[in-house]
Amino acid sequence: MSSEGLASARELEERDLGATRDTEEIPSDEEEGEDVFDSSEEDEDLDEDEEEARKVKEGFIVSDDEEDDSSVKQRRRRKHKRRPRHEEDDGKLSEDDLDLLMENAGVKRTTRPETDATKGRFKRLKRAGSPDESEGQQDTDGRHENRLEDFFSEEEDEEHLGGTENRRLRTGGKDVLDELDDFIEEDEFSDEDEATRQQRRKLKEQRSKQSVQITGLSSDKIDEMYDIFGDGHDYDWALAVENEDDLENLDEYQQEEDDDETSDQKAKKKKITLQDIYDMQDLKKNLMTEEDMVIRRSDIPERYQELRAGLKNYGQLTPEDQLLEQNWISDKIAVDKNFDATYDISEFREAVGDAVRFISKENLEVSFIYAYRRNYISSRDKNGFILSEDDLWDIVFYDIEFHSIIYKRDYVKKFYEQLGIRDSLVDDYFNDESMTELNSLQDIYNYLEFRYAHEINDALLADSSSKTKKHLKNSSYEKFKSSSLYQAVKDVGITAEQIGENIGAETQIHPVVDHPNLKPSESISQILDAASADLQVFAKNHKLAWDTVQKYFAAEIGNNPKVRQKIRNDFYKYYIVDVVLTTKGRKEIQRSSPYEDIKYAINRTPGHFRSAPDVFLRMLEAESLHLMNIKIHMSSQEQYCEHLFQIALETTNTSEIAIEWNNFRRNAFYQALEKIFEDIAQEIKDELKKTSQKLVANSVRHRFMSKLDQAPFIPNPREPKIPRVLTITCGQGRFGLDAIIAVLLNRKGDFVKDFKIVQNPFDRDQPQAFEAVLDNIIQEAQPNVIGINGPNPKTQKLFKKIQEVIQKKQIVDNRGHNIPVIFVEDEIAIRYQSSERGAQEFPNKPTLVKYCIALARYIHSPLLEYTNLSEEELQSLLIHPHQSLLPRHIFKRALETSFVDIVNLVGVEVNKANDNPYYAKALQYIAGLGKRKAIDFLESLQRLNEPLLARQQLITHDILHKTIFMNSAGFLYISWNEKNQRYEDLEHDHLDSTRIHPEDYHLATKVAADALEYDPDAIREKEEQGAMSEFIELLRDDPDRRMKLESLNLEEYADELERSTGQRKLNNLNTIVLELLEGFEELRNDFHPLQGDEIFTSLTGETDKTFFKGSIIPVRVERFKHNDIICISNSQVECIVNAQRHLGVQLKRPASDIYEVGKTYPAKIIFIDYENISAEVSLLDHDVKHQYIPVDYSKDPTIWNLKQELEDVEEEKKISMAEARAKRTHRVINHPYYFPFNGKQAEDYLRSKERGEFIIRQSSRGDDHLAITWKLDKDLFQHVDILELDKENPLALGKTLIVDNNKYNDLDHVIVEYLQNKIKLLNEITSNEKFKKGTKKEVVKFIEDYSNVNPNRSVYYLSFNYEHPGWFYLMFKINAQSKLCTWNVKLTHNGFSLADYNYPTVIQLCNGFKTLLKSSSRARTQEASGSGYYGY
C-alpha cells in the first residue's frame, strides 16, 4: 500500500469519521462470562490507542445538530487565509456587465456600435384577442431579441471602460491624507516596537500616494464625517494593515526603500492582526473575528456560509450525485405532500431539481427564488406552487445534509480502496447509486472495522513514515477467528454472508447443511480435545466454549450489512411505539399533567406523530425525567423473527442432530436480531425526534410569521398614511393613587411628548376632572389612533372609560375622523420597558413611559419592533405551547426564516436604513445579507456620505458583489425623488422603487412601451439611445395605465421568451405589471388589534388550559353586594357568586355571616364573560368537590392501554385508602386492653410479653372494624378481625361484634368466650408430647432422623406454622421408606380443626388423625399428602 493510502487510512482513524456505535457489537463479558479472546494482554500504549480511537470514532456520522455545533467550533479553530484581490474581483462585475446594467437602467454610456446580432429581436406584446401582426413587423421586431442579455456576464471588454470608474476616481488626492496625518501623533502607539512602528509608518506613506475614494468632500467635511462615524471605523486602520493586498504592496514598497535590509531582519517583522490590537471578546461582540471577516468578503449569502461552514468541497458533486440529490430531496419532501397515487411526480422532481440548482450552484436565497424564479417552482398546467417557501427552506437544509452524506460516503469508499481488499458486500453497496442513507453507510463502516481489523492494523503498522500515533484495532473477533475454535462456526452449516442472501431473497437459495454425525456440543468437544494446548481455558468449561462460539456467530450475522438492511427496511414499514411507565411515572403522571395524554399510549405509528409531532417530543422529555420508557418494536415481532429464521437458517430434518443444530442456530440468530432491533430502534428514535422537531418548528414558524405579517395600523384605508399615535396605560390600575401615563409618537415614529394624568377616572365626586384632562391631551396631541394595554384587568375599565369620553365629547382628529381606541399586543413593550435598549434610548424616562413608547411603535410597525428584539428577548417570546421542546438553535432558525420571508416581502428602503438604526435592523434579513454583511453594507453606505440614487450604484460603488447583489437588489429599494436628478451624471430610475429586479428592467420597459402602444421603430430608437426608462415615466403619468397594462397578453409573451431564451418569466411579467401600477404595494395582512379572549389572556395571563368552565380556582372575598358575593381570583378576574351559589340560602343566613372579607375559598367556574373579564362561580361544596377536567385526547383501545390503566386505578385506590387510614384520627375505646397501635406497633409491644398476652387496637380495614393481636409464641402473633355492627356513629363501638362468624355483645364477651378459650387450647397443644418446637425445617429433620433410626415404626408430630399464625403442621411418616406427609390443623376457639372436623382436645385430635390415616389406603394417603384439601 502506498504511503498516501496509509496516511488516508490513518486519517480515517484520527478524524471525525469514526463510527458512532458501541465499542463491541457483541454482548458484554458480564452477560456471557469471561471472553477468552479479549485482548487485555495488550500493552498500555495500545490500550490508550484504543481509547483514543474510540473517542475519535464517536464523531463519525453525527446528527445535523451535532454537525452544526461542531462546524461552529471548527470555524473558530480554523485559520482562514484571506483571498487575494483577484479572487475577490471574481465576485464583481466586469465593465461589460456595467455597460449592460446601466443600459438596462436607462443611463447613457459611450458604447460600441451594435451589430445585427446584438440588436433586440423580441416581438412586442400583443393585446389579448388582437389579430396577429404582419410577418414584416415580426421580422423587424425580432431583431431586438438579444437585448435581453444577462447583465451579469463574466465576459470583459477592455476597449470600452465605462465612465463610472472614471467618475469614481475623479476626486481625492494626496492633500486629503496629508491633512488627516496632522491629527495622528507619533507617540499614540508608544508601546509598539520600532519595527512595528516603522512598518505602520511606511504603510501610511504608501497609502498617501494612492487616490482617495471620498467623492467631492473637503477636508473639513472629512473631519466632520469622522467625528460622526468615527465609532463605526475604530477597526479600519487595523483592517487595512491586515488586508492581504496592502501587505503585499507594503512588502514591495519596503523592497524598494530597503534593498539592503537582510532577510533575517525581514523575518523578525511581525504581521499586525486585529487580535493583536483588540480583545477577542470585543471582536466577537462586534463580529470582527477572522471568521467574521471571511464571511463579510465572500460573495456567498451569509446564511449559506454559516450553514456550509463545516462542509468540505461543497458544491463539487458529480452529475450522478446531482441527480441523486434531486431524487433524494424529492423523496424527503414528498412525504409531507401526500400526493395522490395518480399524481405525476416528474414535474415535482423537476421543480426540486431547479430549486437545488438555484441554491447550491447559483447561491440564490429562498426569498429570491420565491419572488423571481417563481415559474420554476410552479406548475405549468395548474395554478399554484409546487414548492412553497417552507419546502424551499427544507431544501436548503436537506442540501447541507446530502453534501455531508456524500462526503462521508466518498471518505469511506476511499478508505476501503486504500485497504487493498475486495469484498462483494462492500462493492455491491458502492455500486448501488441509490444508497444515500447514513444508516447504511454506518453499517458498511462497522462491517469493515469488524471483518478487517487485522488488515487495518497491518496498513497502519506498515506506514513507517508517519510520525503520528497509530490507533490500532483491538479485535477479539480476529483472535477468535484465528483460533481452532472457529471450526465450530464453520460446522454450523451456513455463513453469515449466505444468511444475508437468503434473507434478502426471502428463500433459502443457500440451504443449511447439518453436520453429518456430530451435535453442536460434540463438535465443540472434539475441537477442544484436538487443540487442548491452545484452548486450555475451555478444558473444564465447555459451556463457556459453547457460549463463545454462539456469541461470535451472532456477531457475524449482526454485522452483515445485507441482514441489517433487510431487517431495517421491514422494521421501518411495520414499527410501532409503546409507552412503558416507570414506577415514578405511574405515580407522578396524573390529571392535568403535561404527559397525561401519553401515559398509556400504545401502538402509535409514524402517522400519529406526523399529525401531532409534539407527542413524541413529550415522550422523550418524560423519558429523560425517568417517568417512562419508549419501546419501539415491530408489530408481531416474535412471528417475524421466527419467519426470518425459517427462510434463512432452519432445516427440515427431524433427526436429533438436526434439531440440536437448529436450536443452536436459532439462539445465535435471535441474539443477533436482538442487537439489530436495538440499533434500529435507536435509529428510528433519533429520526422521529428529528422529524418531530422539524414539524413543531414549522408550526412555530407559521405562528411567528402571523405576528410579523401585519401592516402598520391604518385608521382610514382611504388615506393610507402612518398615523400619529397616542398610547395609554394605567399601570397597576390603582386609580387615584397611581398616575395614568400617555405617550405621543409622530408619523415618523419619533417620540414627541409624554403626559401624566393624576385624576381618578372613576371619581364619583368629580367625574368631569378626568374627562377634561383627557380631552385636552387629545386636542394637543391630535392622534389618529389611541392604543392601550396594561398588566391587569383594570385596563379594561380604563379602555371603556376612554371610549365613553371620546363618544361623549365627540372628539375627532384634525381631519374630522373618529379616533379609534384599540388594544395593542404588549409582549414587546413588556420587554422594552426594562431592557438595556430602552435605557439607552430614553435614560431619563420612567418605565411606563417606555412601555407606552413600545406600544406606539408596535402600532407603527410590528415587524420592526420584532426585528429590534435581542436574541435573548426573541427566545423568551411565547409563540407556541410546545416551543420549549425544541433545541435553542432550531427555535432560533424557525424565527430567523420567518423574519427573512416577511422582511423580503416588505423590502427595505436603502437610504432610510442608512439614516435610521432602528429601521436598519431589518437589513440583516434581506436575501443575501446577514448580521455581518448588513454591518458591512451600512459602513459602505456611510463612506459614500451621500444618498444612494440608484440600485446600480450598489455595484458601481463596490458596495455589493455580484451574487449578493443578485439576491438582494429586488428587495432593496430607493424612493423616487426628482430632486436627486441634479446629483451626478446619473438618472434615477423609477424602477428602483419597485419590486422589479434589475435583471428584469429591460422586460419592464418593454412591457411599458407595449402598453403605451409605441411604434417598434420608436422603441428601437429609445433602446439604442439607452432611454427606455422614459416609457416607465410616461406610463406612470398615464391615467389609463391600469387598463392598458391589464390588456396585455403576458402568457403569449412569456411563451415567446421561453422559446427564445429558455427562461420562464410569466410570474416575473405579472410582478412587473403589478409594480408598474403601484411600486412596493403593501402585501402584508392588516394590523390585528387584540379582540375578545385575546384581551382576556393579555390582561390576566389565563388561557383556556388554566381558566375554563368547570375548573376549581381560589377566590378571595372582596365585598358583599345585596346577597351576592364579589370575589377576585389570583389573576385579578372579578368572580361573582350569586345568592344560589353559596350557603346563605340553604342556611337562611346572610352571606356576610358565613364568609369573611379577605379570606380565600375554593370556587368552581360556572360561566366566563371574556368581554368584561369576569366570571360566575360557585362556593357550594357539591360543586367544588366535582371538578370538570376536559379530556381532549382519544382513549381508543387500539392506541390506549385501557387494561393497564384500570389496573393502575385500582392499585391507586388501594394505596389511597391505606394512606387515608394511616392518616385518620385514632379512635378512643374505653377499655383497659385498648391501645392506639397499628399492627406492627402491637407486635413490638407484645414481643416482650408472655404467651397468651393480647391487646385490642384500631383496624386498618376501617372504622367499623377492630382487631385483637395476641402472642402465640416467640415472634409469632395472630391478628383477629372484629366486625362492628349497630354503631351509633363512626367512632362509637358497635353493639354487636362478629368474630369468626360468631356474635358477641361486647369486648369482654369476646375476650372470655373467644380469646381465653384459644389461649387454653394453645397451652394444651404445646404441652403435649407430640408437639415439637422449632421451624418446619427443624421438625422435618427430627422426623427423618427418627424414622431412619426406627425404620419400621411410624412417627408423627405437631408444630407451629410460622407462615400462618393460628395454624399447626401435623407431619408424619409411615416408615423409613415412605414419603413425609404434612397436614394442616387450625386452632379455633372451641377446639382443633382437621379435615373440616373439629376436635375439642388434643387427645381427640390425635385419635382422629389415626382414624383418618387407617381409613385411607397408602396410595390415597400419599396422594392426599401431596395435594389434598387438608394436606400440601
Swiss-Prot record:
Ranges for the region named Disordered are 1-215
Sequence ranges of Acidic residues compositional bias: 25-51, 178-194
Q: What is its main location?
A: nucleus
Compositional bias of type Basic residues: which residue ranges?
Answer: 73-84
Among CDD domains, the record links this protein to: SH2_Cterm_SPT6_like (cd09928), SH2_Nterm_SPT6_like (cd09918)
- Point to the regions of Basic and acidic residues compositional bias: 10-24, 85-95, 140-150, 160-177
Q: Where are the transmembrane segments?
A: none
Domain SH2, by residue range, is 1232-1329
The alphabetical list of record keywords is: Chromosome, Nucleus, SH2 domain, Transcription
A GO biological process held by the record: positive regulation of transcription elongation by RNA polymerase II
Which spans of this chain does the record mark as coiled coil?
none
Describe the function of this protein: Histone H3-H4 chaperone that plays a role in maintenance of chromatin structure during RNA polymerase II transcription elongation thereby repressing transcription initiation from cryptic promoters. Mediates the reassembly of nucleosomes onto the promoters of at least a selected set of genes during repression; the nucleosome reassembly is essential for transcriptional repression. Essential for viability.
Which PANTHER family did the record assign? TRANSCRIPTION ELONGATION FACTOR SPT6
Query: What is the protein name for this chain?
Result: Transcription elongation factor SPT6
Q: Which organism is it from?
A: Eremothecium gossypii (strain ATCC 10895 / CBS 109.51 / FGSC 9923 / NRRL Y-1056)
**Gene for this chain:** SPT6
